[in-house]
Design a protein with these regions (language model features):
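Short amphipathic alpha-helical surface micro-motifs
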Residues: 11-17, 30-33, 108-112, 218-222, ...
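Short Asp/Glu-rich motifs
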Residues: 83, 170, 258
Length: 359
């Protein structure tokens, strides 16, 4: 039987700044909290463990301030992370569907497991439900808000504080239960999220998903942005309704080297707008998340206008560069002439200083 595991983590970090962090291990988990929901989105159980830190053994002041935890409590009541994580996975069961508020918790869970050389039991790709995303999609016109704001907005407050793992998991579970009733499972369950901790290792593993209203593609890792944008799989635009490969009306362009846009038109389904987000990997290589979405005439015009704005800004930058080069060149050619003029003035002054007495 399928269970929804709604979990939350609290973590600590270097108390002496990022430069003192352990490479590839910026956050150390100090608390695991979770609630279990059945297929009807009813809560059936809770899980909670404190974790005894082994790496960052001094509490970062901001973490202590938010969570109200201290190192004495963690040392006396916490378990070693491998033990706590193993117990958590056993409690989850084999048919678990993970749910979190935001996209950080699964990533940090796996990063901590890797640090302690634990086997990663999750499937690849790892699909989960981002309840923050679902709430924004169905309750806030795609706007993302904080957990406490969503709970307050839905009048779900209880005598439980925020910023502790079990309490945050509980409130996230309450919101998921609410969404499971309205708009209901048929509406929310198609919108799975993809965890990016373990990326596709080759072209065969690249991820292509279709949702109500858009499609998503997650690429393998590329050495550079240029390599990514030279790949046909990255830049192609296919209508997710009929599978037709489309010719672009507006080729991929970027206003900031991080996000790219394009526009195509399907003969049967109309305009299709594309968005590519370049995401860095720790070694400065990149992977691509591409979304394609059908749009109307107004949406198409917004892409066309954005492209024109980028063209104007680029033209203005080029004009300023040419102007600066001309100014530098003019200054360089003017300097020798000024030098000769000064010499001439000195010679004329020297001659004019000769008097008749000298003669």
């Amino acid at each position: 039987m399928k269970n929804y595991i709604v979990f939350d983590l609290e973590w600590n970090q270097s108390a002496n700044g990022k430069e003192r962090s352990v490479p590839h291990f910026p956050f150390e988990i100090i608390e695991i909290g979770a609630v279990k929901l059945n297929e009807n989105f009813q809560m059936t159980g809770e899980f909670h463990r404190l974790v005894r830190p082994q790496v960052y053994t001094q509490m970062h002041h901001a973490i202590s301030e938010v969570t109200h935890m201290n190192m004495k409590e963690l040392r006396s009541s916490g378990e070693l992370f491998p033990d706590a994580a193993a117990e958590f996975l056993v409690w989850c069961g084999g048919d678990a569907v993970f749910c979190t508020w935001g996209n950080m918790d699964l990533l940090e869970l796996q990063r901590n497991m890797d640090y302690y050389h634990m086997e990663n039991p999750f499937p690849k790709p790892l699909l989960y439900y981002d309840v923050q995303k679902l709430y924004g999609l169905f309750c806030r016109e795609n706007a993302r808000i904080s957990l406490d704001s969503a709970v307050e907005e839905q009048n779900l407050m209880e005598d439980r504080p925020f910023h502790r793992a079990l309490d945050d998991a509980y409130y996230t579970g309450k919101l998921l239960t609410m969404l499971g009733k309205t708009p209901g499972p048929d509406a929310i369950l198609p919108f799975k999220s993809v965890d990016y901790y373990r990326l596709p290792s080759d072209k065969k593993e690249e991820i292509r998903m279709t949702f109500p209203g858009y499609s998503k593609y997650v690429s393998r890792v590329f050495d550079s942005k240029e390599d990514a944008m030279a790949d046909k799989g990255v830049t192609e635009m296919m209508c997710y309704r009929c599978g037709r490969m489309l010719r672009k009306k507006i080729r991929w362009f970027t206003p900031n080297q991080k996000t790219y846009f394009a526009l195509a038109c399907c003969p049967d389904h109309g305009y299709l707008k594309g968005k590519i987000r370049m995401k860095k990997v720790e070694d400065e290589s990149v992977f691509v998340v591409k979304t394609l979405k059908l749009t109307d005439e107004e949406g198409a015009q917004s892409i066309i206008q954005r492209k024109e704005d980028v063209r104007k800004k680029r033209a203005e930058r080029n004009r300023m560069k040419r102007k600066q080069k001309q100014a530098v060149k003019k200054a360089a050619t003017a300097s020798p002439a000024d030098g000769r003029s000064a010499s001439s003035r000195r010679r004329r002054k020297s001659k004019s200083s000769i008097t008749t007495k000298d003669v």
